[in-house]
Structures are given as structure tokens and as C-alpha cells.
Amino acid sequence: LEKPMTESVSEAKELNVIAKKSRCIFQIGHLEQFNPAIRKLKSQLKAPEFIEVHRLCKFNPRAIDVDVVLDLMIHDIDIVLSLIDKNIKKISVSGKKVITNLIDIANVRIEFEDNVVANLTASRISTKNERKMRIFLKNAYFSVDFMSNELKRLMKNKNNSFKTTSFQFKKSDSLNEEIKNFINTCYGREKS
């Protein structure tokens, strides 16, 4: 299914109930989950404490029928929720209409149990395109650059020095990976 899968939370819950009753599998189109940098990050990451995300782009009139949260930030919300396995305690949201009649810049702060925080900013009004995620945890830092397909890891060693490791990934066909995952899920070979 394309995002947003429904126009309201109640419709989404209803669709989920219908799918479960009919034993129908559906998957929401979140391509970034199939980004090799995110997959590598998930294999390396333990107990994130703070996540900072920026998804900024130059104005493009192609997507002005939807606000910046549903157009851009939705990808980052999905990734953050897949990285943090804790209950949400509080969500704070701020957004502004700048050029269009819908929200063009938004900031969301999600507070989880155990003082884990994610701060997400999305804007479709910028002088440059930027898509970065920074993850802070005890004795380590990860940085994902979605545009260059690069993951960097900074780890504190036992002697209090730091080691930086970079992982560069080739551009991959995330849509193809997502479709393969869906097919394998339907055949019971993978979990979606």
C-alpha cells in the first residue's frame, strides 16, 4: 500500500482488522527500510538514546497536495520506530505553512520510556537537499547519509580513544528489495 495507507487512524485500524480476519498480508511502502545503510545500521545498533533526523529539500511543486509530514517525514518516523523498541511517552509537534497552504516545515519530538528521544525535522523549503540521521548511544555515534548511501560509526575504545569506521553502499533498488520482501512474506519465508 502507498502511504498514507488511509486518511485516518480509525480507518487504518479497521483495515488492519479486515486484513487479519481475511488472513490478507499487506505492506506499507516504506522504501528506506530496504536501504542498505539502514539495514547495516540495524545490525550494529544497540540501545539508541538520542536520534536526530533532518530531511530537507529544495521546493518542488510536485507534492504540494500533501503536507511535509506525510510527504517526507513519514519515512523517518517509520525508521525511528523500527530502531527504538520502547513505548512512546510523549509526542510534541510544531509545523508552519511557508509557501503552500499545507505544513511546509515540521519538527516532531518523540519521547520514549527510559529518556530515549527522537527529534525529527522535515522541510520542503531549503537551499539544499539533505537527508541525514544521527544516532547517539553509550560510547558510540552513528551517522547515516541517505543521499550518499554512507553509514559512519564512531566508537569509544577501552583506552578512551575513538575509532571511526565508514561503510559506503552502492545505490540499490530499494523498491525491488521491498517487493521481494513482500513476496517472501506472502510465501512465509520472511517477516515483513
Question: Residue ranges of each PLM-predicted region?
Answer:
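Beta-strand-loop-alpha-helix segment that lines the small-molecule cofactor/substrate pocket
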Residues: 1-30
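Short, flexible active-site-adjacent loop segments at beta-strand->alpha-helix junctions, enriched
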Residues: 5, 30-34, 47, 54-57, ...
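Short, conserved glycine- and acidic-residue-centered signature motifs
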Residues: 8, 69, 73, 175
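A general structural signal for well-ordered alpha-helical segments in protein cores
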Residues: 12, 34-38, 76-77, 172-180
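Predominantly a Rossmann-like dinucleotide-binding segment in NAD(P)-dependent oxidoreductases
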Residues: 25, 32-99
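A short glycine-threonine-serine/GTX helix/turn-capping micro-motif
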Residues: 64-70, 164-173
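Contiguous beta-strand/loop segments that form the cofactor/metal-binding neighborhood of enzyme cores
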Residues: 77-150, 176-190
